[in-house]
Amino acid sequence: METTIGIALTSFLVGLSGAMMPGPVLTITIGETAARLRPVGSIRHGGNPGDPSPGPPGGAQLLRGALAGPLIVLGHGILEVCLVVAVVLGLGQLLLRDSVVGWIGVVGGAVLVWMAWGMFRSLRGLSLGAAAGRGERRRHPVLAGILTSLANPYWAVWWATIGLGYIALSLKLGTAGLVAFYCGHILSDLAWYGAISLSLVLGHRLLTDRAYRGLVAACAVFLFGFGLYFGYAGVRALVA
């Protein structure tokens, strides 16, 4: 911890332990990766737009799927850069107030429930062979990374406690220490969520229409559960 390499390494390990725990960002990463494995247009595979089995994902779809995790981490990381700066400027104590944690939980929980509801509504029409001509619009992974991070009150609390402590230690080495801390932390997210997307891409041949809908449904259930839990925790913090 007395060198920039030590700070980066320990920051990576602590960040990885947190990233590996189930949460909204993991759920969105799985859902977005699966969605991006769908062929952009079934006509490219020689079938009609409504053909339920136009063929396996092509190289472009595999690449899009593999990039889902890194793009979500990009959105997550952009938000964390802003938060690191804010914490350094004194926002840490504000984030520990019950009223702030409470409102983050209530609003964040509502956002997660809304995202889950949208996933539930889309289940009936989901298909790996869906054509781009249907005009389906999806949330960009970078935006999804930002929204899911903002919706999690425990993310803000982590930065106001563990993150604040790490920042204080890092600043003993000046700007270099702070940069080392952030790089180690964000690389842990990139390593884990990138690995999740890559594993889904490598196993894409097992992703049938039925399995895809089941995966999206499971993600929606988890998001809905997280939303209710965050909302409940937020209300408890507000009435405490």
Label every PLM stretch briefly.
Residues 158-170, 230-238:
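Alpha-helical transmembrane segments and their membrane-interface junctions
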Residues 25-26, 79-90, 112-116, 155-156, ...:
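Alpha-helical transmembrane segments and their lipid-water interface positions
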Residues 97-127, 185-196, 207-240:
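Selective transmembrane alpha-helices of multi-pass membrane proteins
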Residues 125-144, 205:
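Flexible interhelical linker loops that connect adjacent transmembrane helices
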Residues 12, 16, 20, 117, ...:
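Hydrophobic/aromatic residues within the transmembrane alpha-helices of Major Facilitator Superfamily
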Residues 2-102, 162-180:
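Juxtamembrane transmembrane-helix termini in multi-pass membrane transport proteins
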Residues 20, 139-161:
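Selected transmembrane alpha-helices and immediately adjacent juxtamembrane segments
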Residues 11, 15, 19, 141, ...:
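Helical-face signature of the major facilitator-like transporter fold
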